[in-house]
């Protein structure tokens, strides 16, 4: 089903299921003996969502390499890719803490548990924004686990298509102090104009010294819808009904680095391949089966 301007979802369907998929990847990467990341909450959160495909994947009962055009090396690269992505954004927040930033905003937070697992200074406030049912689910599951946030956590149940800047201010965001923003795994699910509007709003709410991190997929401009639809077929055959071709917004859009620089941010990007090299992992071979291609991880600081 194609996206609409007011579509809804939970963590087992549509865009929400991709958040669960990402958390399953974090759970698997957390078991890796190389110890690149440690997210102890990812696995219990995925189990609580209850999507059988992801549970079997975490338990080793389903090997991704049985899927068409997915070799064992490619399956491992999927997990490694989640490891380097998670570490990049964990390190980003670590650098923000070291610089003295004491408020963080996680947009479309999904099953992100950084408020619970990162070593925040005691006076830090972490704001999380997502759809109401997603916020409620994660909050309740983590409470049932006895987990306690390691910072002051302020969860804001709002769709990012709504007036989230007003909601964020109402929740206590101090726009006179620097903020560390995170938009992880979000941009491909936004129309091009909504991507620009997101960074316009972030800029308007940010004091000098603020930072922002995200990832950008240049291949979304000429995204191969047919190939993505074909790739979704084998997943459906194994019980996972996610059709990426219907979830993402394709077409021309501004490059995030260029757009942020034009807004006064000092922005830099690093490719996923470079992150693999940086972390001592085998760089995946380029694949014609990947409808998105390379991913660029971006961090920026607001000057002035």
Curated annotation (Swiss-Prot):
Entry keywords, A to Z: Methyltransferase, S-adenosyl-L-methionine, Transferase
Enzyme class: transferase
Gene Ontology MF, one: methyltransferase activity
Signal peptide limits: none
Pfam families: LCM (PF04072)
Residues that hold S-adenosyl-L-methionine according to the record: 130, 159-160
GO biological-process terms attached to the record: methylation
EC number per UniProt: 2.1.1.-
Function, in words: Exhibits S-adenosyl-L-methionine-dependent methyltransferase activity.
Protein family according to the UniProt entry: Belongs to the UPF0677 family.
PANTHER family, A to Z: S-ADENOSYL-L-METHIONINE-DEPENDENT METHYLTRANSFERASE YKTD-RELATED, S-ADENOSYL-L-METHIONINE-DEPENDENT METHYLTRANSFERASES SUPERFAMILY PROTEIN
UniProt protein name: Putative S-adenosyl-L-methionine-dependent methyltransferase MMAR_1057
Biological source species: Mycobacterium marinum (strain ATCC BAA-535 / M)
């Amino acid at each position: 089903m194609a996206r609409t301007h007011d579509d809804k979802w939970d963590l087992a369907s549509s865009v929400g299921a991709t958040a669960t998929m990402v958390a399953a990847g974090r759970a698997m990467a957390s078991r890796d003996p190389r110890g690149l990341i440690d997210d102890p909450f990812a696995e219990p959160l995925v189990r609580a969502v209850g999507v059988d495909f992801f549970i079997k994947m975490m338990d080793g009962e389903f090997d991704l390499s049985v899927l068409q055009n997915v070799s064992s090396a490619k399956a491992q690269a999927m997990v490694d890719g989640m490891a380097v992505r998670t570490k990049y954004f964990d390190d980003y927040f670590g650098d923000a803490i070291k610089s003295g930033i004491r408020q963080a905003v996680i947009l479309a937070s999904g099953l992100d548990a950084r408020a619970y697992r990162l070593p925040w200074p005691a006076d830090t406030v972490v704001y999380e924004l997502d759809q109401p049912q997603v916020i409620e689910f994660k909050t309740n599951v983590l409470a049932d686990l006895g987990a306690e946030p390691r910072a002051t956590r302020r969860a804001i149940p709002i769709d990012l298509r709504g007036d989230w800047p007003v909601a964020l201010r109402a929740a206590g965001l101090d726009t006179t102090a620097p903020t560390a923003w995170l938009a992880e795994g979000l941009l491909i699910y936004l129309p091009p104009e909504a991507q620009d509007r997101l960074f316009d709003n972030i800029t308007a709410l940010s004091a000098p010294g603020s930072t922002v991190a995200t990832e950008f997929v240049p291949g979304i401009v000429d995204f191969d819808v047919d190939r993505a639809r074909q790739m979704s077929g084998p997943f459906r055959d194994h019980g996972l009904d996610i059709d990426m071709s219907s979830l993402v917004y394709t077409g021309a859009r501004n490059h995030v680095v260029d757009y942020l620089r034009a807004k006064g941010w000092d922005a830099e990007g690093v490719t996923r391949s470079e992150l693999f090299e940086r972390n001592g992992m085998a760089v995946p071979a380029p694949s014609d089966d990947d409808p998105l291609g390379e991913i660029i991880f971006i961090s920026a600081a607001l000057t002035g």
